A protein has these predicted regions:
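Short Pro/Gly-enriched beta-strand edge/turn motifs at strand-loop
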Residues: 1-3, 72-76, 145, 312-321
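A contiguous strand-loop segment
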Residues: 3-127, 147-271, 278-280
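Short, well-ordered beta-strand elements within core beta-sheets of diverse protein domains
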Residues: 131-137
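Short, charged, surface-exposed loops that flank catalytic or proteolytic processing sites
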Residues: 137-143
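Extended, Lys/Arg-enriched charged tracts that mediate electrostatic binding to polyanionic substrates
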Residues: 145, 151-154, 306-308, 316
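Glycine-rich, aromatic-lined ligand/substrate-binding cores of catalytic
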Residues: 223-350
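Substrate-recognition/cap regions that form aromatic- and gly/pro-loop-enriched pockets
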Residues: 308-451
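Histidine-centered catalytic/metal-binding microenvironments
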Residues: 428-498
């Protein structure tokens, strides 16, 4: 639900998934998100930002005038900016040279009680500038949370947002609720979190190293009598209940997506809840070890095989339009950031090893357009540059750019899904097989090469990927158009002799 916050800034609606390293088949840490917008046509570019590109620059947001002087020492990082920087950069997601991954943001809203005493700051930090001012300047996930928290403390926040961080050791989810208050939680190694446009972190343990939080947040809640929890003595501090919302809009637009994530990743937990339960768990254990494709399937879901699928045949007209699905025509891109889990080193040691090229490259699996119709492409983040064909997308439809080819797959597929479903499914299956083989082949080739040659192995691998994935997309689009032409209702049975 893209919406305007109290500050008047445009909000984007997204769905996020975070997976700890003991919950994946290969020990990877995964943070993932769909980037949605108010329109199906808000093109994205994929690029590698060189080290130091904005060092010492005064950054001024095109969205709300937020202004900050950036420090020196910025690292190289990957980014997915909008093609209209004058309206805000919106770099959204990436991995830097120290192998810190960040995805920003998961839009949310705080309730009126807390905003009354700590309102949004009109020209404070918002989604459009968040990745740009944090990711190049941190070397661990915890440093990412810390730097973002310090910026919010100094400049204020223009909106409520959730932010995902990961490194080789851990994943963190940070929720900025009000103008200056926030909480972050480390995702337990054997757990998963699914978030959908609501403040979601539950009980906060202020004595645990698994939580970080804004200075004075407990005093703020106590001073303004904001905690409604029952019980004598020290009452539980449930961040979701104190700062979050639970409205009819949430139960139609947000909560059902979390339930759908549970349905796909922990079905036995989903069975214990209704689609609109307000007490769905923030973190949970999946019913199996997960891979990138499992997380991608969750982000590609449109309530498949349920009565709530808007392009399905189960249920009725009412049920199919009742709840918002995870994947939308308005999804601009979907990403799964994969970082190899490392044991026996500290986060700081991992950062130093990453900067020397000694660790396996993180992978950004990205689907341009709507992920249930577009393939996830494994782009290696240790490449010095990404394929130029993915950069500088045209602001209006242009099939000469990959973004618009992938965007067209959704436009050609979902309106007459009964006609395109089989071909689209076969295409996605074929692309997954090719992508998984490609990622493994490049990964093994790079690790077998001398450290100083690995970056070039990754860059060549990305270039080869771009060639076949774009070519395959063009062929698939042509096949879809032919199928739709043959199935057109604007026809009539003809005499074969004419």
């Amino acid at each position: 639900m893209s919406k305007k916050g109290f500050d008047g800034l445009m909000r984007r609606s997204c769905t996020s998934v975070l997976v700890g390293r003991a919950a994946t088949r290969d020990g990877s840490i995964l943070i993932a998100r769909n980037e949605d917008n108010t329109t199906p046509a808000a093109p994205k570019s994929l690029r590698m930002v060189p080290a130091g590109e904005r060092d010492g620059v005064e950054l001024v947001s095109g969205a709300n005038g937020f202004t900050i002087a950036l420090p020196e020492g910025g690292l190289r990082y990957s980014a997915m900016p909008d093609v209209t920087p004058e309206e805000g950069l919106f770099e959204e997601a990436g991995v830097n040279a120290a192998h810190v991954a960040m995805s920003a943001t998961e839009s949310a809203l705080a309730n009126d009680r807390v905003l009354a005493f700590d309102p949004y700051v009109e020209n404070g930090l918002a989604e459009d500038a968040m990745l740009t001012v944090v990711l190049p300047y941190v070397k661990t996930a915890r440093e990412g949370v810390k730097r973002l928290g310090e910026i919010v403390a100094e400049y204020g926040s223009a909106e409520s947002n959730g932010v995902l961080f990961a490194d080789h050791l851990e994943a963190w989810y940070m929720e900025i609720a009000t103008g200056h208050h926030w909480v972050a939680q480390r995702i337990p190694d054997d757990c998963v979190a699914v978030v959908a446009n609501q403040l979601s972190i539950q009980e906060v343990d202020f004595e645990s190293g698994s939580f970080m939080y804004s200075e004075g947040i407990r005093e703020f809640v106590e001073e303004h009598a904001l905690n409604s929890a029952l019980g004598g003595g020290e009452r539980p501090f449930n961040f979701r209940e104190i700062f979050g919302t639970s409205s009819d809009g949430d139960r139609r637009y947000n909560t059902p997506r979390v339930w759908d994530g549970l349905r796909l990743l922990a079905p036995e937990i989903a069975k214990e809840h209704t689609v609109v339960d307000s007490d769905l768990p923030f973190v949970f254990r999946p019913n199996r070890l997960l891979g990138v494709e499992d997380v991608a399937a969750a982000l590609s879901s449109h309530f498949d095989e349920t009565e709530f699928d808007p392009i399905g045949t189960a249920g009725d007209e009412f049920s199919r339009k009742r709840y918002r699905a995870i994947a939308l025509s308005r999804t601009q891109e979907s990403h799964v950031l994969q970082i190899e889990g490392v044991f026996g080193l500290s986060a700081e040691q991992c950062a130093q090893a990453a900067l020397k090229g000694e660790l396996a490259s993180p992978i950004c699996w990205v689907a341009l357009g709507t992920p249930c119709f577009s393939p996830y492409m494994p782009l290696f983040c240790d490449a010095p540059m990404w394929p130029a064909c993915f950069d500088d997308a045209a602001p209006k439809p242009d099939l000469g750019h990959p973004y618009w080819v992938f965007r067209s797959l959704q436009a050609a597929s979902d309106a007459r899904f009964a006609v395109t479903q089989v071909r689209s499914g076969d295409y996605k299956s074929e692309q997954w097989q090719k992508a998984l083989r490609h990622a493994q082949r490049v990964h093994r080739e790079a690790l077998a090469a001398p450290v100083e040659e690995r970056a070039m192995v990754y860059e060549k691998g990305n270039s080869k990927l771009a060639q076949w994935v774009v070519s395959d997309a063009h062929k698939h689009l042509a096949a879809l158009l032919l199928d739709l032409s043959i199935a057109s209702p604007l026809t009539f049975k003809m005499n074969p002799n004419l």
